[in-house]
């Protein structure tokens, strides 16, 4: 049974309030400031009645030196009340200003802290999610949750706290003031209350629905922008400016349309609340004109009630306006909490080892990706011992990279079989321990917007010296181009290494793997971006790296794996051939055909 929208909203709100627990002192201080602010407003209105009734009275003429002074209005002034009035006003508004400062500072502090904490939690949760989740999610939506959604939540939280506390206290104070002065007249306004409640409930549902659509639309805008920026060169090369412009215009207009839906709902709700409030005010004015009411009213009392009613209109309007903001925040909260509730990567293994020997075995492994009926791997069975090199070759999409991804548990859920490292199932290892045994160089190199040295030393377990970085870069034949750069190892590579060539990026990635010095090495098309000269130069370094390490090499260029101890030919998820380079050529099967296609007869 699904929760009602109202119950769901309060569940989300209570969960959001949990983020304020570490700041409960600041929260209480802000609430006190807001309460004082609202009470001062009510106190100021309550001052109107005595000021009129006692400050100005028609009960007796004004007296000066024992002589009655006629006035055109028939009132005389109580000088003591009139003299006290300015002092009271100054004190009230000074207190109100101080309370406003305290509450504003406190809410700003909590909002900034809330944004920081939620962003940190979302970012850390991204790092704990499986690769399969990232494969199917829209990158723009993921980024939007960190940037846009968290801002919406903080803004809504601050606005909601201000209105819910300050404006509610003001309204309650004004109602109390009205009932204290004339409960009969004040009952008139309660007739309108339920009608306002129904209107606000209906509008709230509309706000929440449209706000969720806005979150999605903003994610689409982020995704389209990111896609264009990443593919900027291709867009220019293929003359796709008009295509991208039209695509973004469509997405952008959809976002505008969703925002206009919210604006219309907000524009309709506020005047509607005001019109309903005007009926209440008109009803009070009518009731005050009745003879039965006049007997109990003084000029000051009526002015107080009227002033209280007028003073309530703006807080009611604020509550209606903040309702739209609040619903946007709840919608953003819902999407963020759905993300945070996503099950992180499974890490139930407890086995740890400082350094594995590197004996790797696939035991009759079958695997299919989530949502795919066809198996990506079918009964894969092989063993590679410490210090040996296993090469995987085959057509694109045959399953080579899937085998490599399973070793690091990027994907889980084998349909049959097991994968063992040193005769221990990789699923018995803790993720941290397992992945510390593996160094990976893929065909899609990821470099961070930092120096070359820091990219080579990325995530190195422990302190790393400059000499170690230089040694790794030298073995990867990266120092050849690094020494020619103005800042050498301290050269900034730009976002994802955009300031370097493809071959240079690949060699930095290889140097990173060399520095890691893991017992298992996975090279997924590691030399694909290198020219022939660079490829030959780096082979000696790779041969040195492979010594006493288990190496799994996925290669398109067959010249790079001729020295492999074992070569597996993979086709449609199955191993169709296995052997050494020489034996497979003699076999005259698929490997021989692939070799012939690259090098001729």
From Swiss-Prot:
Subunit-level organization: Homodimer.
Entry protein name: ATP-dependent lipid A-core flippase
Every ABC transmembrane type-1 domain range: 28-328
Keywords: ATP-binding, Cell inner membrane, Cell membrane, Lipid transport, Membrane, Nucleotide-binding, Translocase, Transmembrane, Transmembrane helix, Transport
Protein's organism: Shewanella oneidensis (strain ATCC 700550 / JCM 31522 / CIP 106686 / LMG 19005 / NCIMB 14063 / MR-1)
Membrane topology: Multi-pass membrane protein
The EC number(s) this enzyme carries: 7.5.2.6
GO molecular function, one term: ATP binding
């Amino acid at each position: 049974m699904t929760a009602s929208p109202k119950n769901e909203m309060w569940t989300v709100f209570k969960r959001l309030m949990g983020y304020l627990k570490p700041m409960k002192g600041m929260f209480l201080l802000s609430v006190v400031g807001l309460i004082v602010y609202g009470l001062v407003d009510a106190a100021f209105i309550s001052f109107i009645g005595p000021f009129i009734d006692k400050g100005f009275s028609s009960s007796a003429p004004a007296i000066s030196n024992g002589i009655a002074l006629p006035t055109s209005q028939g009132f005389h002034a109580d000088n003591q009340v009139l003299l006290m009035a300015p002092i009271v006003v100054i004190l009230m508004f000074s207190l109100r200003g101080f309370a406003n400062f305290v509450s504003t500072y406190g809410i700003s502090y909590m909002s900034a802290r809330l944004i920081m904490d939620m962003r940190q939690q979302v970012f850390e949760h991204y790092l704990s999610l499986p690769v399969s989740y990232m494969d199917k999610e829209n990158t723009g939506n993921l980024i939007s949750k960190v940037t846009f959604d968290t801002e919406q939540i903080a803004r809504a939280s601050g606005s909601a706290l201000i209105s819910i506390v300050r404006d509610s206290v003001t309204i309650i104070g004004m109602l109390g003031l009205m009932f204290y002065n004339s409960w009969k007249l004040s009952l008139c306004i309660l007739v309108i209350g339920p009608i306002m409640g129904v209107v606000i409930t209906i509008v709230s549902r509309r706000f929440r629905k449209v706000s969720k659509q806005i979150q999605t639309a903003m994610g689409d805008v982020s995704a389209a922008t990111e896609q264009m920026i990443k593919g900027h060169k291709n867009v220019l090369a293929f003359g796709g400016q008009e295509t991208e412009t039209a695509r973004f215009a469509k997405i952008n207009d959809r976002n505008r349309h969703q925002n206009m839906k919210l604006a219309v709902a907000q524009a309709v709700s506020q005047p509607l609340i005001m019109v309903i409030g005007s009926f209440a005010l008109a009803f009070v004015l009518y009731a005050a004109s009745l003879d039965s009411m006049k007997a109990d009213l003084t000029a000051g009392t009526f002015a107080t009630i009227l002033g209280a009613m007028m003073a309530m209109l703006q807080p009611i309007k604020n509550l209606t306006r903040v309702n739209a903001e609040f619903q946007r925040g709840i919608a953003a909260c819902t999407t963020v909490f759905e993300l945070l509730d996503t099950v992180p990567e499974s890490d139930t293994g407890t086995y740890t080892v400082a350094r594995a020997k590197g004996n790797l075995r696939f035991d009759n492994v079958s695997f299919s990706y989530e949502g795919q009926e066809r198996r990506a791997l079918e009964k894969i069975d092989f063993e590679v011992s410490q210090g040996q090199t296993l090469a995987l070759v085959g057509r694109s999409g045959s399953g080579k990279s899937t085998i490599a991804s399973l070793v690091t548990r990027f994907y889980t859920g084998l349909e049959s079989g097991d994968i063992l490292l040193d005769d221990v199932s990789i699923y018995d290892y803790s993720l941290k321990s397992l992945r510390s045994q593996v160094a990976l160089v893929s065909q899609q190199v990821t470099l961070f917007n930092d120096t070359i040295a820091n990219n080579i030393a990325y995530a190195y377990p422990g302190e790393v010296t400059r000499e170690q970085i230089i040694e790794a870069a030298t073995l990867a034949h990266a120092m050849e181009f690094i020494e020619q750069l103005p800042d050498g190892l301290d050269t900034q590579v730009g976002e994802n290494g955009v300031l370097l060539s493809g071959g240079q990026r690949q060699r930095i990635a290889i140097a990173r793997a060399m520095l890691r010095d893991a017992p298992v090495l996975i090279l997924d098309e590691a030399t694909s971006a290198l020219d022939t000269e660079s490829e030959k130069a780096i082979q000696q370094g790779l041969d040195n790296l492979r010594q006493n390490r288990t190496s799994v090499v996925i290669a398109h260029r067959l010249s790079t794996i001729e020295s492999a101890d074992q070569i597996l030919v993979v086709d449609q998820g199955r191993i169709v051939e296995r052997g050494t380079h020489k034996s497979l050529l003699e076999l005259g099967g698929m490997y021989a055909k692939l070799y012939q296609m690259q090098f001729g007869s």
